[in-house]
Design a protein with these regions (language model features):
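Local beta-strand/beta-hairpin segments that build beta-sheet-rich folds
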Residues: 9, 124-131
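Active-site metal-binding motif and surrounding structural segment of the metallo-beta-lactamase
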Residues: 40-91, 119
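A glycine-rich helix N-cap at a beta->alpha junction
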Residues: 108-120
Length: 305
């Protein structure tokens, strides 16, 4: 199968620690890179991931809290210093463009490429915001102290592989192969019809990845998340700080696990840990008690979908 990897660059929350970096991830889907959130120091972690800056053209920002955007101006400046010439597309709430324009004008004077801002929807409905031949990206409505949304990456299923034995046996010409891959049947010169499923191997299933941070518990998103291969869900607090989670519109590890269980996802990864936890094992234990296939996010973790 073609590559679909998620690189965790940072999984901490607002207060800096020596253990975790602020929120940021890189998705490598068929060698095309997408960034989710860009906390302070994200470009350093990007370097450490050994992914190529040149393959990044789309950045998705969940919300306008500093621990999710303070690394953005530094990354954009570095790309200009490196001589980038092709556009960078940033998907964020509309206020980010207003905030970033003066910084770009001041710190990135003479920037070598265009920065294109795409305003995220503000209503409480999932919407398609990006579409190419390999993937679709949808918003996930979240509830936080400022407008916020997560992102659902849905890989488009690749075309099925042709059965070489049938192509040779039926002497199907080369020009017809693409249409067969796309679902066409084949009729021989003497009128015999061969159904498409006789001519191809079954196509591989498209994979999916969901990112939900920052948010309180949102069970109404379960239908949207149903069956995703990997769900990254914030777990800022444990049960010991459940009142604080309610107050700040964050989630507990148990709530993240409940979302994963009800949505019947393949794997849960929890992150966005509060700095008050020196050891996140307590969060992992609380989540695994509800959804056993849970991992702790950590910098450098690579998820292979």
């Amino acid at each position: 199968m073609e590559k679909f990897d998620v690189h965790i660059l940072g999984c901490g929350s607002a207060l800096p620690t020596l253990k975790h970096w602020p929120s940021s991830q890189i998705i490598n889907l068929r060698e095309k890179l997408f960034m989710i959130d860009c906390g302070e120091g994200a470009q350093v972690q990007f370097r450490r991931s050994r992914q190529k800056f040149s393959r990044l053209s789309h950045i998705f920002i969940s919300h306008l809290h500093g621990d999710h955007i303070f690394g953005l101006i530094g990354l954009l400046s570095t790309l200009s210093l490196a001589g980038r010439t092709y556009p960078m597309h940033i998907y964020a709430h509309a206020e980010l463009e207003t905030l970033m324009k003066p910084w770009l004008d001041f710190f990135c004077k003479g920037i070598t490429y265009e920065v294109v801002f795409h305003a995220l929807p503000t209503d409480n409905v999932s919407q398609l915001i990006y579409d190419d031949r390999s993937v679709q990206v949808f918003t996930i409505p979240l509830k936080h102290r400022v407008p916020c949304c997560g992102f659902l990456f849905k890989e488009k299923a690749p075309l099925p592989h042709i059965r070489r034995d049938m192509i040779d046996y039926l002497e199907i010409p080369y020009y017809a192969i693409q249409s067969i891959k796309e679902g066409a049947d084949w009729t021989t010169p003497d009128g015999r019809v061969f159904a498409n499923n006789q001519l191809v191997f079954p196509a591989e299933r498209g994979r999916s990845y969901a990112y939900c941070s920052d948010t309180c518990y949102q069970p109404q998103n379960i239908p949207l998340l149903r069956g995703v291969d990997v769900l990254y869900h914030e777990a800022t607090f444990g049960k010991d700080n459940a009142p604080r989670a309610v107050e700040t519109l964050h989630s507990t590890a148990a709530q993240a696990a409940q979302m994963a269980k009800q949505a019947k996802v393949g794997q849960l990864v929890i992150g966005h840990f509060s700095s008050r936890y020196d050891d996140e094992q307590v969060l992992l234990d609380e989540a695994k008690a509800i959804f056993p296939n849970t991992l702790l996010a950590t910098e450098g973790l690579v998820l292979n979908l």
